[in-house]
């Protein structure tokens, strides 16, 4: 019995360690670390790459994509930066913004369907901002070539609007640039009803000699966003190299010492991802390209994911056409899956961090999404998905609780052995093993079903944590955002007392419900005789209550509901096996005064 309990204690402690690590993301030191990092970066002085003298804003074919369009620190406001450049408006059902004609850059994108808070009157999410602002974030596609080509479009090229006055779902726009040798570069930009921009480039060579050039693309972000130090989700650089290639994930800190270069391949994509939003470029899929992730220092530190293609040649009097894609928006699962199929983008669904248990996590989301679409409430979808998972694992749970019932049935004999052998632990263990053998009981049989359920638990946890569908999704009553902590607090009587409480005392209704259900679940079993184990057994629900209070309400509701189902499941199975349910007896035992042993 003691060995079996030790397994459960080990599992519980492992979960505590994991959750304690996640809990650190609420620590105010995160902001201090961010400020310290910005100060460190601002002190570094490194000369940044500039366009070659005499060449229209490109570089040589052997050069790398541009690192930055300016050495100056970003001081302009977003409105000022937008107002001082020529632009073409973007207006769709999903996106508002504009294209900067300097560099044909996408640096002004706001997401109409998402607000900063649950209040619909709050500002909509700003994804992209111009490079000369503090939060500059943009994508850009251009060319690099030898100077004799006559110049190619790059970061400082001012394109001309040839057709269309506004980019919408039904009206593309065409930009053109003609260099000093008469080579014509044209770019037609179209957009779907969501977040995918299609770029069709054409290069016409009317001259008497062939020209050679390469293409580049980059996603550049000023500074480093504040990222909670949790292992649950990846935020930073990511990409797939090759049509059947593997995913590359790099954190911002991974590239601060030196750039990370991915081997040249044909096909794939690259970009930068946040928890809910992403910016990604899909280069032309027929030409090999090299991918690089880097940190650019100087007065304006920035992080960049870029690619550079192999050199391509356009003969005299000929032309070439290239097609690229830019994704800039919300990581909606059905939409990302559709883009992977519709545009043949390899492994584009990995834009969403499904984790190690992809084969469990994604089907779990599809089930939850089915319930969400049917009932229209993501909280209800969480509850129903948990029921289905519990039902699927009922046979395993039955074995687990049957083993526990058998152990309870053996409890009187165990007590007799304990009284017989006293403090002789070696003799006690030998007698226990003999008893297990006689009763044909495996003391660890109840642990394996639990261990098999752990990946499913983490998969469900992952779905709830990472998917944008839970963001600002209401439940019932006071829960208006399942992705935010329960806003109530026990320490001001859930809002009845007119004062705010410190963050660490924000113990809301749902964390309390979770703590109570966890307490009841643990009291379905007798308190361990070992004092240390008994103390852990007693305090764990309280510790979890405080820890999970700062977690998204959707996760806490899931945990409370899962505990409730587990209690019902355990009671049913133990009753079927003739084991006494000692929940209330165990609770009463907490308050009994233990007799003082005479010396």
From Swiss-Prot:
Q: What are the entry keywords?
A: Cell inner membrane, Cell membrane, Chaperone, Membrane, Protein transport, Transmembrane, Transmembrane helix, Transport
| Annotated signal peptide | none
Q: Which residues cross the membrane?
A: 6-26, 378-398, 448-468, 501-521, 536-556
The protein's GO terms of the molecular function aspect are:
membrane insertase activity
A Pfam family per the record: 60KD_IMP
- Primary residence: membrane
Which domain of life, per UniProt?
A: Bacteria
- Annotated region described as Disordered, given as residue ranges: 35-78
- GO CC terms: plasma membrane
Low complexity bias spans: 41-76
BP term (GO), one = protein insertion into membrane
Q: Which InterPro entries match?
A: Membr_insert_YidC, Membr_insert_YidC_N, YidC/ALB3/OXA1/COX18, YidC/Oxa/ALB_C, YidC_ALB_C, YidC_periplasmic_sf
Q: Enumerate the subcellular locations listed in this protein's record, separating them with semicolons.
A: Cell inner membrane
Membrane topology type:
Multi-pass membrane protein
Q: Give the protein's biological function.
A: Required for the insertion and/or proper folding and/or complex formation of integral membrane proteins into the membrane. Involved in integration of membrane proteins that insert both dependently and independently of the Sec translocase complex, as well as at least some lipoproteins. Aids folding of multispanning membrane proteins.
Please state which protein family the record places this protein in.
Answer: Belongs to the OXA1/ALB3/YidC family. Type 1 subfamily.
**Subunit and interaction comment:** Interacts with the Sec translocase complex via SecD. Specifically interacts with transmembrane segments of nascent integral membrane proteins during membrane integration.
Q: What is this protein called?
A: Membrane protein insertase YidC
Q: What organism does this protein naturally occur in?
A: Agrobacterium fabrum (strain C58 / ATCC 33970)
């Amino acid at each position: 019995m003691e060995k079996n309990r030790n397994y459960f204690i080990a599992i519980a402690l492992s979960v505590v360690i994991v959750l304690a690590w996640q809990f650190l993301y609420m620590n105010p030191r995160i902001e201090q670390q961010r400020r310290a990092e910005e100060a460190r970066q601002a002190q570094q002085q490194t000369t940044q790459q500039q366009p070659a003298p005499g060449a229209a804003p490109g570089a040589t074919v052997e050069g790398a994509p541009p690192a930055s369009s300016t050495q100056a620190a970003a001081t302009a406001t977003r409105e000022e930066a937008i107002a001082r450049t020529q632009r073409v408006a973007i207006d769709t059902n999903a996106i508002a913004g504009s294209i900067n004609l300097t560099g044909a850059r996408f640096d002004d994108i706001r997401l109409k369907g998402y607000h900063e808070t649950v209040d619909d009157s709050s500002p909509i999410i700003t994804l992209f901002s111009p490079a000369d602002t503090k939060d500059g974030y943009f994508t850009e596609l251009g060319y690099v070539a030898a100077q004799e080509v006559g110049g190619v479009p790059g970061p400082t090229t001012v394109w001309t609007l040839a057709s269309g006055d506004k980019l919408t779902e039904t009206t593309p726009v065409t930009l053109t640039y003609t260099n000093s040798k008469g080579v014509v570069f044209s770019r037609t930009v179209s957009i779907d009803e969501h977040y995918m921009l299609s770029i069709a480039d054409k290069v016409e060579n009317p001259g008497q000699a062939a020209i050679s050039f390469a293409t580049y693309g980059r996603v550049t972000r000023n500074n480093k966003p504040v990222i909670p130090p949790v292992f649950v989700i990846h935020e930073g650089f990511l990409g797939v190299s090759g049509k059947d290639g593997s995913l590359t994930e790099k954190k911002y800190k991974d590239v601060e010492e030196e750039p990370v270069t991915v081997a040249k391949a044909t096909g794939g994509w690259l970009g930068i991802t946040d928890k809910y939003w992403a910016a990604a470029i899909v280069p032309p899929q027929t030409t090999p390209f090299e991918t690089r992730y880097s940190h650019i220092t100087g007065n304006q530190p920035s992080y960049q994911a870029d690619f550079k293609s192999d050199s391509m040649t356009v003969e005299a009097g000929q032309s070439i056409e290239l097609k690229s894609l830019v994704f800039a928006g919300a990581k909606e699962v059905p939409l990302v899956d559709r883009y992977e199929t519709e545009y043949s983008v390899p492994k584009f669904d990995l834009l969403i961090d499904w984790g190690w248990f992809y084969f469990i996590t994604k089907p779990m989301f599809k089930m939850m999404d089915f319930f969400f679409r049917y009932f229209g409430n993501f909280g209800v979808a969480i509850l129903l998905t948990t029921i289905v998972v519990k039902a699927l694992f009922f046979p395993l749970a039955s074995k687990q609780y049957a083993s526990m019932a058998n152990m309870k049935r053996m409890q009187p004999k165990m007590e007799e052995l304990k009284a017989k052998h006293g403090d002789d632990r070696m003799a006690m263990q030998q007698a226990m093993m003999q008893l297990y053998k006689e009763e044909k009981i495996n003391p660890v049989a109840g642990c394996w079903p639990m261990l098999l359920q752990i990946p499913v638990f983490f998969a469900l946890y992952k779905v709830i944590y990472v998917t944008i569908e839970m963001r600002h999704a209401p439940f019932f009553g006071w829960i208006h955002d399942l992705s935010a902590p329960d806003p109530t607090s026990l320490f001001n009587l859930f809002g009845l007392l007119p004062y705010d409480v410190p963050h660490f005392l924000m113990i809301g209704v749902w964390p309390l419900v979770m703590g109570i259900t966890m307490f009841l679940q643990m009291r379905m079993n007798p308190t361990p005789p070992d004092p240390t184990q008994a103390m852990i057994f007693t305090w764990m629900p309280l510790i979890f209550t405080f820890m999970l209070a700062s977690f998204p309400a959707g996760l806490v509701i899931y945990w409370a509901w899962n505990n409730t189902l587990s209690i019902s499941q355990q009671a049913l199975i133990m009753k079927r096996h003739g084991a006494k349910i000692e929940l209330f007896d165990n609770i009463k035992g907490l308050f009994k005064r233990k007799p003082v042993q005479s010396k």
